């Protein structure tokens, strides 16, 4: 049986708030990662030399982040719209939405942190060669990652950082 119009409107209002919160947090995660990379891997002389190019650079990065996050939110919106034809599906999507958003946000944060570490080692952002690591001796690669990077601290920091969005989504 299809959900009532009032139920649809009420649930969609709540979902819109969650999507907006996710959008803001995800853009902030990507922007924060870009800030860390920028200040960690450039010096003051370089920033002075290319000062006129910084605003367009930041704008281009922001627009890219907005595009990626908006496409991600669009997938959640599409699922919610398709679920409107069934009361059970609508309720299930409403219950699962925040967990899906939190999982994707955690993935974005983990990829951002991974990209910062990857850049620190290889002096370039993630590229197709990062996937080539699987073709190498995976055990040796994982051993190197485990010994050279603060994996446990990064996971603990990510888990702690996700407490804030989890709390915000729970409100």
Predicted regions: what they are:
Residues 86-87, 159-171:
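Cytosolic-side transmembrane helix boundary signature
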Residues 82-100, 171:
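Cytoplasmic juxtamembrane regions at transmembrane-helix boundaries
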Residues 33-64, 100-157:
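Membrane-interfacial interhelical loops
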Residues 11-24, 92-106:
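Alpha-helical transmembrane segments and their helix-start/interface "positive-inside/aromatic belt" motifs
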Residues 19, 23-27, 31, 61, ...:
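Alpha-helical transmembrane spans of integral membrane proteins, capturing the lipid-embedded, hydrophobic core
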Residues 44-48, 72, 92:
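Solvent-exposed, low-complexity, intrinsically disordered
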């Amino acid at each position: 049986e299809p959900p009532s119009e009032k139920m649809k409107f009420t649930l969609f209002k709540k979902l819109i708030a969650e999507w907006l919160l996710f959008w803001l947090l995800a853009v902030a995660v990507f922007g924060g990662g870009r800030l860390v990379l920028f200040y960690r891997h450039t010096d003051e002389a370089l920033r002075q030399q290319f000062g006129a190019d910084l605003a367009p650079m930041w704008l281009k990065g922001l627009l890219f982040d907005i595009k990626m996050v908006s496409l991600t939110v669009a997938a959640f919106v599409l699922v919610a719209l398709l679920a409107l034809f069934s009361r059970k599906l609508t309720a299930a999507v409403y219950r699962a939405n925040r967990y899906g958003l939190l999982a994707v946000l955690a993935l974005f944060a983990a990829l951002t942190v991974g990209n910062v570490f990857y850049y620190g080692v290889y002096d370039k952002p993630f590229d197709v060669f990062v996937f080539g690591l699987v073709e190498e001796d995976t055990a040796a690669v994982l051993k190197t990652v485990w010994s050279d990077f603060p994996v446990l601290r990064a996971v603990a920091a990510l888990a702690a950082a996700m407490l804030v969005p989890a709390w915000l989504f729970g409100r």
